[in-house]
Amino acid sequence: TTVRASVGNYLVSKFIAENSNCKVIFNGDGADEVCCGYVYLKNAPNPEALQKESEKLVKEIYYFDVLRSDRSISSNGLEARTPFLDKAFVKYYLSIPAELKIFDGINRLEKYLLRKAFDSHGLLPNEALWRRKCAFSDGVSSQNKSWHHIIQKFVDQKISDDEFIRERKIFNHCMPQLKESYYYRKIFEQLFGNNEQLIPHFWMPKWVKTQDPSARELTGYQE
């Protein structure tokens, strides 16, 4: 989803750069990792597993989404600030008992404690504060025609089934499981050579049965 989300990230940054005098902007990176906001986390088998996954996401964020935002935003001449990754905030939130971070997505929304902290100040309208999470990488597109489906249709025209089955095996580290990831990997290898070890693993949501990291592919996801 990092590559998918980079497109929306880049276009929003481009619009800001072309239509305002802003040079430094805030973004929401880190909130899902620190505050347990990803939809799949509601399937954590116990509070301990939820806490462990949150800490892992925070530890590895510089490999994925933060790097994506930095490149997408700075390429448009802007500087990003990530308040949810403030060291004091991260340290404090990770110290909160995991039992208080559990959510079901219905009676208790993801990032409940973060939402509740702003509930009595009037800083945010309720329709923004209490709306359901909308996955960014697919949230740039309609539910009838998701962004990841658009990309996959494009890739199908570029990569044949035979090529995918035959050539993906040359990548021993993080072997591509989908044509889309194989397409990205080919571009990466052309630009950066054999440096795939820089990424420790291919990110996928835990505790769910899916081959695609898109939140819209998860059972129970609603926007």
Give the residues covered by each predicted segment.
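Mid-to-C-terminal catalytic subdomains of enzymes
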Residues: C22-K52, E60-Q177, I199, W203
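Internal alpha/beta domain cores that form substrate/cofactor-binding pockets in large enzymes
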Residues: L57
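Proline-centered flexible-loop/turn and helix-kink motifs
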Residues: E18-N21, A98, G193-N194
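Acidic, carboxylate-rich catalytic segments that either coordinate divalent cations
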Residues: Q157-E223
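Soluble or luminal CAZymes and related metallo-dependent hydrolases
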Residues: R4-G8, L109-E110, E180
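ATP-dependent adenylation/nucleotidyltransferase module used to activate substrates
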Residues: T2-E33
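Active-site phosphate/pyrophosphate- and oxyanion-stabilizing loops and adjacent acidic/basic residues
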Residues: Y10, K14, K116, K186
